């Protein structure tokens, strides 16, 4: 029987598989390392995984993979049909497993501080079917700690302060170090503290890290700052432990343990007697080694002959004692003062009072220097009174001043005219007597405040000032008058006895007992039939009607003179006029219409007169307007004055060329005399090499030729002209042609014999052109013969 190719291949595969299983059963499984491993128990009723924790040391530095442990399943008979796989944290990257034996190795260096344990999953599979023969099981590989981290001070370097003079054991600051090693395993993380630098001044608690003072009475003024070095060591400080250090800067803070002291036992200062009050005479300062509030001073004068003359106060910024003047100094009265000054701390510390008194005293002597002082008045203000009726030259009062210096120089007086501009007063230069220089009026100025100057005769620059207040006493020199300009109305239907106005009076005088006015009608009006007056005895009076039946048509205005007398001595009086207008009133007595003529008649003009004046003014304005209009329309005469000679006038033509529109219609032939031939300008400074011929006339020549020839002539003139600018410039030319039949009158060639123009028509233009006709007429030959 022959086998096909397919059957032959299957047969060979079966033989190869049989040989492989036979070899595996005969071969021995590789023995594991001597390190213990954990596997499932042989006796079980149900297949399962049971694992303990695996441990591996951190920081393994060997060249070979580190053996961790062994996985084993009770299904594995050692025949090679079971393979092990590993999954989870670090599988394949950190941890590898021998799929035949289940041995686990670590291929990388592990650090417990980075990761303390790894969670993995184990799986046993059938090698042929790749199916699990055991349920997946989870286990942990824990990293075993070694002492590979030194203690670290996370908050360093430290700064702290402690009061000076503190007792031993005063807490300064606490330092703390941390160790990243496992605190639950061994002594790798157990730290103790010690001081490497800073002894014998400070100490540190080994377990807590609290720094304390180790010496008493440390003085800030001797040394105010200390640098400490603190060490933290693990393994409880044993040999082989790791350590770390930090620095601590300790500053001694100030306490008030130093009293103030004056550098000198006495001081001397000089000051002129002219110093004003509150001026600074001297500054003294007591030294204090303390700082801040502990160095703040208080100064006071405890003794001496200048207690009321001087005072001392502290300067908060500099802690100096400032001595100032309270009263004016006088060299002639006292030449020197002695002061006993005490300086003390503002806040004393009771703990240090035993060190001595916290105050000190010194002596200050102040020498007063003599200066040339201005004269001094005996009084700062001289009040005086004078009646306004006083005659010129009357003595008002006297001022007195003296020279305070020892020389006692004579004094001369004068009035500061800036305070007496109207020169109402005079003063005697030697005696100081003040007199009136003008008549006084209390109503104009009731009080005069003047300044009197006193100067030394020997030194006029020394001037003293005295102040005089002169009150003007009142006399009754002003008559009473109406309090206002009264004007009232009376109704046509007013009844007798009706009050139509209440009046009052004023008086510029000011009597000592007050004003009292008396009102009455003048003698000639006392018995008038229209109005009456009632004095109210309170400086007012009432005006009443005496009758009824007032009519505007009969009389529209009444004038009532009123006599007013004051109570002065002697009394004065005046007559004031009250204007009463008659008005048409309603039933309630309210005026409706008053005669308008009453407002015009006092001015002396009637309504008709005002209308006539207004009409005249308007007529005058119209005439002025017509004259101005006619003058503006007036034209200049076309014919000159016959007596004026035409040759005495110069006519200027300043017309400039037109714009683009005018230029387009420009006729060159009409703008110049084509019969005139101009000579070419030649240079006068050199001999010409070419003689220019006379130019032909441009009559009957096309315009473009005229333009070309004209520009060519101007170009030649510019080339030979020595005064032409040496650079290109814009040249402007204007033609004054022969637009008139008479051609150009300004051309000198027009009177030559070559001209064939007939000027006989000039004789027909009148006497103004007579002279011109003689020059250009038929008789011109005789004119030039």
Curated annotation (Swiss-Prot):
Residues 629-785 are cytoplasmic. Residues 28-607 are extracellular. One of its GO terms (biological process) is cell-cell adhesion mediated by cadherin. InterPro entries: Cadherin, Cadherin-like_dom, Cadherin-like_sf, Cadherin_CS, Cadherin_Y-type_LIR, Catenin-bd_sf. Residues 49-153, 154-262, 263-377, 378-482, 482-599 form the Cadherin domain. Glycans are attached at residues 449, 530. GO terms for cellular component: adherens junction; catenin complex. It is a single-pass type I membrane protein. GO terms for molecular function: beta-catenin binding; cadherin binding; calcium ion binding. Residues 28-47 form a propeptide. CDD domains: Cadherin_repeat. It comes from the Eukaryota. PROSITE patterns: CADHERIN_1, CADHERIN_2. Residues 1-27 form the signal peptide. Keywords: Calcium, Cell adhesion, Cell membrane, Cleavage on pair of basic residues, Glycoprotein, Membrane, Metal-binding, Repeat, Signal, Transmembrane, Transmembrane helix. Pfam families: CADH_Y-type_LIR (PF01049), Cadherin (PF00028). The keyword Lipoprotein does not apply. It is found in: Cell membrane. The chain crosses the membrane at residues 608-628. Its main location: membrane. Three calcium ions are usually bound at the interface of each cadherin domain and rigidify the connections, imparting a strong curvature to the full-length ectodomain. Cadherins are calcium-dependent cell adhesion proteins. They preferentially interact with themselves in a homophilic manner in connecting cells; cadherins may thus contribute to the sorting of heterogeneous cell types. This is Cadherin-7.
């Amino acid at each position: 029987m022959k086998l096909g190719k397919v059957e032959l291949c299957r047969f060979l595969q079966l033989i190869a598989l049989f040989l492989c299983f036979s070899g595996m059963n005969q071969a021995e499984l590789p023995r594991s390392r001597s390190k213990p491993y954990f596997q499932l128990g042989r006796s079980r009723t149900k297949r399962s995984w049971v694992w303990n924790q695996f441990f591996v040391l951190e920081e393994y530095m060997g060249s070979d993979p580190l053996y961790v442990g062994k996985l084993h399943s009770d299904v594995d008979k050692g025949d090679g049909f079971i393979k092990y796989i590993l999954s989870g944290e670090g599988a394949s990257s950190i941890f590898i497993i021998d799929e035949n034996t289940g041995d686990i190795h670590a291929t990388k260096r592990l650090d417990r501080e980075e990761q303390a344990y790894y969670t993995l999953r184990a799986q046993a599979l059938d090698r042929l079917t790749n199916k699990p023969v055991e349920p997946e099981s989870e286990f942990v590989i824990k990293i075993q700690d070694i002492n590979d981290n030194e203690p670290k001070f996370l908050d360093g370097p430290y700064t702290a302060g402690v009061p000076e003079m503190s007792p031993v054991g005063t807490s300064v600051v606490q330092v703390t170090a941390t160790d990243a090693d496992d605190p639950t395993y061994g002594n790798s993380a157990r730290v103790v503290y010690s001081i490497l630098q800073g002894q014998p001044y400070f100490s540190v608690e080994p377990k807590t890290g609290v720094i304390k003072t180790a010496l008493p009475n440390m003085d800030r003024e001797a040394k105010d700052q200390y640098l400490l070095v603190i060490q933290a060591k693990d393994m409880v400080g044993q040999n082989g432990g790791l350590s770390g250090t930090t620095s601590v800067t300790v500053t001694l803070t100030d306490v008030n343990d130093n009293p103030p002291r004056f550098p000198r036992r006495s001081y001397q200062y000089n000051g002129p007697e002219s110093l004003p009050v509150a001026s600074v005479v001297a500054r003294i300062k007591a030294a204090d080694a303390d700082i801040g509030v502990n160095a703040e001073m208080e100064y006071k004068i405890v003794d001496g002959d200048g207690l009321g003359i001087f005072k001392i106060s502290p300067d908060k910024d500099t802690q100096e004692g400032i001595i100032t003047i309270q009263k004016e100094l006088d060299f002639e009265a006292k030449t020197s003062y002695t002061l006993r000054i005490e300086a003390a701390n503002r806040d004393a510390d009771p703990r240090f009072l035993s060190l001595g008194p916290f105050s000190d005293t010194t002596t200050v002597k102040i020498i007063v220097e003599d200066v040339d002082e201005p004269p001094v008045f005996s009084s700062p203000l001289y009040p005086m009174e004078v009646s306004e009726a006083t005659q010129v030259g009357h003595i008002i009062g006297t001022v007195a001043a003296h020279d305070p210096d020892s020389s006692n120089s004579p004094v001369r007086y004068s009035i500061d005219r800036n305070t007496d501009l109207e020169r109402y007063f005079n003063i005697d230069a030697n005696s100081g007597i003040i007199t009136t220089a003008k008549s006084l009026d209390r109503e104009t100025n009731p009080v005069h405040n003047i300044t009197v100057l006193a100067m030394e005769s020997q030194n006029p620059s020394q001037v003293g000032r005295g102040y005089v207040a002169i009150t003007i006493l009142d006399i009754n020199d002003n008559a009473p008058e109406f309090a206002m300009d009264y004007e009232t109305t009376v109704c046509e239907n007013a009844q007798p006895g009706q009050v139509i106005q209440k009046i009052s009076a004023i008086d510029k005088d000011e009597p000592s007992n007050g004003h009292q006015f008396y009102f009455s009608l003048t003698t000639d009006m006392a018995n008038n039939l229209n109005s009456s007056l009632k004095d109210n005895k309170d400086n007012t009076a009432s005006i009443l009607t005496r009758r009824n039946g007032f009519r505007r048509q009969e009389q529209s205005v009444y004038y009532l003179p009123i006599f007013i007398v004051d109570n002065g001595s002697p009394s004065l009086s005046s007559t004031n006029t009250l204007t009463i207008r008659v008005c048409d009133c309603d039933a309630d007595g309210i005026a409706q219409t008053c005669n308008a003529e009453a407002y015009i008649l006092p001015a002396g003009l009637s309504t008709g007169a005002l209308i006539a004046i207004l009409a005249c003014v308007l007529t005058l304005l119209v005439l002025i307007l017509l004259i101005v209009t006619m003058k503006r329309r007036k034209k200049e005469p076309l014919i000159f004055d016959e007596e004026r000679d035409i040759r005495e006038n110069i006519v200027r033509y300043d017309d400039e060329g037109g714009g683009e529109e005018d230029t387009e219609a420009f006729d060159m032939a009409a703008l110049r005399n084509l019969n005139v031939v101009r000579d070419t300008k030649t240079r006068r400074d050199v001999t010409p090499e070419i003689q220019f011929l006379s130019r032909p006339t441009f009559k009957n020549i096309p315009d473009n030729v005229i333009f070309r020839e004209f520009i060519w002539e101007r170009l030649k003139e510019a080339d030979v002209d020595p005064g032409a600018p040496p650079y290109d410039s814009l040249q402007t030319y204007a033609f004054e042609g022969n637009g008139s039949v008479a051609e150009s009158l300004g051309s000198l060639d027009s009177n030559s014999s070559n001209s064939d123009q007939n000027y006989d028509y000039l004789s027909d233009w009148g006497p103004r052109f007579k002279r011109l006709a003689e020059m250009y007429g038929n008789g011109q030959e005789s004119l030039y013969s």
